[in-house]
Amino acid sequence: WTFVMNKEDVATTLFQEFLLKTIRNTLLDEFGEQILALYDTLASVPLIVTSTLLQKDSSDWFDNIETPEKETRDDIIRKSLLDAINSLQGKLGGDVKEWQWGRLHKVEFTHVFGSHSLLRKIFNIGPFPVGGSHSTVNKGDYRLAAPFVNTVGPSTRQIFDLSDVNNTKAVTPPGQS
């Protein structure tokens, strides 16, 4: 796996689902659904905090306070991977080759009038399969509350040819910039 997170990648899908399950399995028992939902509004903070915790051999955050056992980081990783596989089988079926990232990760360019169901098809564009993630140059961030619905992406892309300024290229996706 190249870690590029193309829309065709299967490994990206498993990795992103694993990250999502790891965040929930690490934080949900301490926070509860309501506080985790509020915490989720802080951009990539849940992911950053969980990634930092995973670098430690042990932390009280890994222990599920709702069980009598004391869970470890490795227990959370193991559980999260199994949860991710089960979740993807439910969402995308049993054929792993069909687990392309773009089947889950989509972008839709929405218009304010498109929030009404009768006008959605007239004003909104998409959804389209898209690559990227929270940590790639082709930004494709999403929230825990709406997994894999791309909410943050590049607003413009430009290539400047400094030897020939007239050869400069730019593209802007639909929507406001």
PLM regions with names:
Residues 1-177:
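C-terminal/peripheral segments of proteins
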